[in-house]
Every structure is written in C-alpha cells, then in structure tokens.
Amino acid sequence: VADCYVSKNGALTLRSSVLVSMTMAELSQQGKVTVGTLRSSDPALFITGVADGARAITDVLALRGGELTNLVLSAITGVSGEVSRFSSVYPMDINGDGVTEVPRTVSLQGGDADHAVSQRVDWISYDASGTASRVLSTYHDVADGWYLQLPEGWPERVWVGRSASPDEIGITFYTDSSREESYVPVLRITALSGSERERLAVRTGRFILGRNDGVIYVGELLKGNQDWKYSVTEDEVRASFSLIGTEWSAGDN
C-alpha cells in the first residue's frame, strides 16, 4: 500500500491510500522508485519491482481529484497491468521530451522469448487517465553498457545475434527480407576491450560510436543495409547510439 499525506497545521495527515503491486521487501531487491512526469504534464511516481527475478512490474501513481491513484492497477487481479520480462532497465525520460516512459520488454520477431539477446524494449508513456502510448523502441545491451534507438521500420523487422571473444563482443542486426534464405546482416555494433582495440576500431568499414572505461564501441554497416527500405547512415547510427549510465535503485545502499 502507498499512502499520501498532506501537511496541515504543521502535522502530517493521511489523505488517501492506494494498492501497489509489490511489497517493500520485494522492492528492496531490484526495485526502483522514479519521480517522473505523465504526458499530461502531471507529476507521477513510477514504482518498479521485480517478481521472481524475472518479471518487471511497474505501478504508476498520480493524484486524481486530490486522491492518490494507481493508473495501471487491474481491478480484477489487483496487480499492475504493466508487466514484462525484466531487462535491468527502469522508467526514465528516454527521448528527452520531459515525459517519463516505462520500458516494456518485447520479443523480437522470430526471437527466443526467454533469451535476453532476442528482446527489444518498447518505451511507453501514460496520460492522467492511464492511457498508454508507445513512444519509441530500443535495443538494450545492458551487459556491454550501450543501447540503440531502433530506427523507423526496425522494431518489427529485425533479428539479433550475439558473438563474443575475449576482446570483442558484437551484436548483429539482421533483416527479415526473406524467411526462406539465411538472415541478411544490416548492422553490427562491437565493444572492443583488448590491447589492440585502437587498431581494431579503425579497421575498414568500422566507425567509432563512443568510449567508456577502456572500451571502444564501433559500428559497421553490412551488406543488408545497402538496398533495404529502412537502411541507415553512419551518422544516423551515431545519433541513435547511447551509453548506459549507472542509476540508483531502491535496493542500493
């Protein structure tokens, strides 16, 4: 239960209460409380808990008519309807528009629903009535510290594969141009961490996306990008690429 108190004559008085999906014990593990904003510009609290270490459940709390309300709580189940596979990503303003978006993990077309590599993240905003709207989609490589805002046409049309060696970890995006042929690679993003990373970063076809803690991130446009309807340029990849920062969560001490 979440309580809303008001200050009156120097004392706090309980104004209203609302059910939330997770207990404090559950929130203290991998949970996070985010102070944010709805599409209607109203302030809101986004409370994310993780059930069984696998499912992210987010409640969205806001004042409606002066009463605390859980905008996404199901009257039937008593639990938030904003549930998806946990991907170590929490609500944030993903696109800098001043509105807080909730990450919703979705299986990529043809992907393994239980495999983190095969997941994209849809970012969902809410208004004061609890109406959801998808803002954009990203591919988050949390383990390697980066994410890519998926270009127009990509979310429902790409597969992803991961390759790893001691000094290089690569994520390759493939098109679905033909289900009867092998997947066609479009873009590869590689994290270089070995002693040869500076030399490898400027290998033919590669372009640098960013650097962080001894790691160089590079992109490489592949053959499937050339004639594809949703092809991208190097500059578009750079603009869509971001490093993942460290954030506080309810379980941090």
Model-derived regions: residue spans:
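Surface-exposed beta-loop interaction hotspot
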Residues: 38, 121-148
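Repeat-based blade/solenoid architectures
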Residues: 20-34, 76-90
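Structural motif
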Residues: 1-7, 52-65, 108-128, 132, ...
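Loop/turn-rich, solvent-exposed surfaces of beta-rich toroidal or solenoidal domains
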Residues: 38-66, 151, 155-161
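Acidic/hydrophobic-patterned starts of short beta strands in beta-sheet-rich repeat architectures
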Residues: 1, 37-49, 94-106
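Beta-propeller fold detector
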Residues: 14-22, 70-76, 133-139
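Secretory pathway targeting signatures of secreted, lumenal, and periplasmic proteins
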Residues: 151-201, 207
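Surface-exposed amphipathic alpha-helical segments
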Residues: 219-253
